[in-house]
Amino acid sequence: MDHAESAVNKEGSSLKISGSLPVIPTPFRDNRIDFDSLLRLFDHIFPELEGYTLCGSTGEAPSLTMDERIELMKFATRNTPPSKTIVVGLTHTNLEEMTRLACTAEELGIHAGLVPCPYYFPNTFPMVLEFFRALDRASGLELVLYDNPVYTKTWLTADQLLAMVDACQH
């Protein structure tokens, strides 16, 4: 998510994302999240970056349990200066679990959720639009589209992206 200009800039949306917010890896030791190493990574990146993205593909999100993802979000919010932006990947094949992640992220004060189009099954644009509307209605978390058509098998046009912006409040 490097050099993003902004999340949805709509009335009621005050989030402004700027700068470099790379997806950071999730370190492991003995098959468990290595929070000491993650804290050292934070100490290394905070002077250089405006924030970071947690639980993206590079952050091993598809391999993490829901409890591990939530534990990571809690750790991140406790150990990140308020001046830094935190975006969290909400990738999941189940809308209910994505909603749970989004609501938890919002409660913890995370700034935005990185959301891919539904994946695994082929999508039509109306399906994608309703998916984003449902996630948007369920949470007040700002949503950032993770456009990865190779893996989601969903290619979006500029007009479709604009329709998504119009359809969502966050």
Which residues make up each language-model segment?
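Basic phosphate/pyrophosphate-binding loop/patch that engages nucleotide-derived ligands
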Residues: D166-H170
